[in-house]
């Protein structure tokens, strides 16, 4: 199986999302930048599968130029595949992405406002505050555009009424 180590990393960290209550139930998604058959892309958690049952073959490879409906994997990619793809396209330093629906971040994001620099740890997101992407329906192009805008000069943002997303060098 191609990219087995990366697939296992995604499963390991997906389980951590559940066990730490960062993304209860089947919510949230994780991806890693990857190459398969000389195609640049990313591996992403599948849609609708419980993390506890994930196997390496369940993780979906998506090319950076691919739309979900054209993917021939047995499993469908996460419904949020679009903003994962767009982050990888727009943020060349992004190697891993985690999107979670933590109860705390979702509650804070319902205000639709950025988190001000009240603590030095805010700087870890890459700016003087943590932006909040405007609300849009999950899985849409509009949501992806809103996330990319909120991530300008940053590596993390809230998603209004939805949770948070962050990218980095690894999981």
What are these model-derived regions, one by one?
Residues 1-171:
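Glycine-rich flexible loops
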């Amino acid at each position: 199986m191609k990219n087995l180590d990366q697939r296992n990393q995604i499963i390991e960290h997906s389980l951590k999302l559940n066990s730490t209550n960062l993304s209860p139930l089947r919510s949230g998604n994780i991806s890693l930048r990857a190459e398969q058959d000389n195609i640049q892309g990313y591996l992403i958690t599948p849609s609708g599968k419980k993390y506890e049952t994930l196997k390496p073959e369940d993780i979906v490879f998506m090319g950076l130029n691919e739309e979900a409906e054209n993917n021939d994997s047995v499993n469908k990619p996460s419904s949020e595949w679009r903003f994962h793809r767009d982050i990888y396209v727009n943020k060349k330093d992004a190697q891993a992405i985690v999107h979670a629906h933590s109860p705390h971040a979702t509650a804070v994001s319902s205000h639709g406002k950025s988190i001000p620099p009240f603590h030095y740890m805010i700087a870890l997101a890459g700016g003087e505050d943590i932006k909040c992407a405007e609300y849009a329906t999950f899985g849409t192009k509009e949501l992806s555009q809103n996330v990319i805008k909120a991530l300008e000069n940053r590596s993390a943002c809230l998603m209004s009424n939805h949770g948070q997303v962050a990218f980095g060098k690894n999981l």
